[in-house]
Amino acid sequence: MKYFLIYISLIFCGFNTHAQINELGVFVGGVNYIGDVGPTTYIAPNEPAIGILYKWNRSPRHSYRFSYTQGSLKSKDIDSDVPSRNLRGYSFENSVKEFSAGLEFNFMDFDLHDSKTKVSPYVYSGVSYFIYDEIYILGNTSHVDYQSSTFAIPMMVGIKGRFFQNFVIGAEVGFRYTFTDNLDGSNPENDNFES
């Protein structure tokens, strides 16, 4: 089973530079995990996430977006509404660092050259490369085996606004479809575990 990572960006702030074509900002939010271990609630951040982002605004409707985000994924079967998971009792913690690039599309013109207040909903998708701990579960506790990396597809929706000349603030919610089945340690790729 592939995993969905839910990322909620509570706040990201951008400061416009170079004639309002480039944006550089910080990202503060929360993260939660959906997979084989723990609860299955899609939007329930239980750990903080931070990052930086850069946008190159090609037009009032789209921009190229590059970001770095890091956070910790934690989940416990005891927090699940599924009785079989409660009985199993697995838990894990995994550190994740993500590099992402993609296209952000604004549903309304978001022209940073215009001095008027601007607000627009948007969608974002692209490709992410992330580094995580390859873990395994032994005795209902996760253990780090080695560090690994893979790709993911981020998909996000949000709303942003510019209320001051050089300041953009927004909120978004999204998830990542990952190409690994072992963020939670339930499917280790270590040869020592094969029979």
Feature names for model-found ranges:
Residues 20, 44-48, 95-99, 117-119, ...:
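Residues that define the transmembrane beta-barrel architecture of outer-membrane proteins
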Residues 26, 52-56, 101-105, 125-129, ...:
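Residues on the lipid-exposed face of transmembrane beta-strands in outer-membrane beta-barrel proteins
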Residues 78, 163-195:
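Predominantly the C-terminal beta-signal and adjacent terminal strand-loop region
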